Amino acid sequence: MTPVALYSPDPARGWLPWVWLTPILMILFNAVPVIALDGWMQSQHWSTPRGDPIGLAGLHALLWIGFAPTLAAVLAWARLVEGSSLASIGLTGPAPLKTFLRGLAVGFGTVALVVVTIWMAGGMQAAGLGQAWRSPVSLLHIGLLLASFMFQASVEEVIFRGWMLSVVARKTNVAVAVLLVSLVFCFLHFSPHQPPMVMLSTFLFSLFACAWARWTGNIWGVMGWHAGWNWLLATGFELPVTGMDAHLPALLVALRPQGLDTLTGGAQGPEGSYLCSVFFVAAIVWIQWRKTRVPHNVSLTSR
């Protein structure tokens, strides 16, 4: 395979970093703001010394304040150092809002499919139906969380599947780019004592997102999917998303895990279940199969 411009033929008018430098830059773009803001976040009682969010306010702070500086740093680097256009990092294509919203709907559907599959396998027990609808305040918070997760998910897609994937692909090839992006994505989501199944699911999550972006030729759809996945998982079932609790009643059905952590995902939530990994493998295979049947730049969410 040869170097390729994934999203746009627009040339970089500045300097593209060496391949070995891109993971270091990505880690710095994420780590420096976290370290700089850690003391202040703790002083506001928004995070613990380990960096975990405290309550609903802490979750909002993490999703906005924790990700905004990273987005600003990556966009500034892409524009000022590389001279890259927004199109070259995946923010291109017709009807971006429509594509994003369709991706959002796919996110709702796919995470619901995973949760229902775990429940049917005996890993979940229902403990209440639509309790959030009894509280207007809870519904308001759930709506605000949708905006927060839309921002957080969009930032992650811009920096990983947008900027990093496109830069490495221009310097090497698509296979190396997908592998490197997914490894760095895993590294930045790693926490001590995390079960191997969780890391496998995180790696497959990134492979799936890369496959989607690679096929559609933009990141609008996968941005929406990522947001829909995180939000409904956090608010729909009273289950943790990547180990974080929204502290809100369920929008759909309150579920309680039962059985082995390999089935339920344990403290990490359904993303730590082997059934979630099975879903990602099947979805990646489906995308690869679809690529042989429809044109490369047809949106995944346009059918």
What are the residue ranges of the model-derived segments?
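N-terminal, membrane-interfacial amphipathic/helix-forming hydrophobic leader that caps
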Residues: 1-86, 234-303
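Juxtamembrane helix-loop-helix connectors linking adjacent transmembrane helices
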Residues: 35-61, 84-155, 165-170, 300-303
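Residue-level signature of the transmembrane alpha-helical core
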Residues: 64, 104-108, 142, 146, ...
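Residue-level recognition of membrane-helix boundary sites in multi-pass small-molecule transporters
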Residues: 88, 176, 198, 220-221, ...
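Membrane-helix interface segments
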Residues: 95-97, 138, 171-176, 194-195, ...
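Membrane-interface helix/loop boundary segments of multi-pass membrane proteins
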Residues: 155-180, 211-218
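Membrane-interface helix caps and helix-loop-helix hairpins in membrane proteins
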Residues: 188-197
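Functionally important transmembrane alpha-helices
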Residues: 198-262
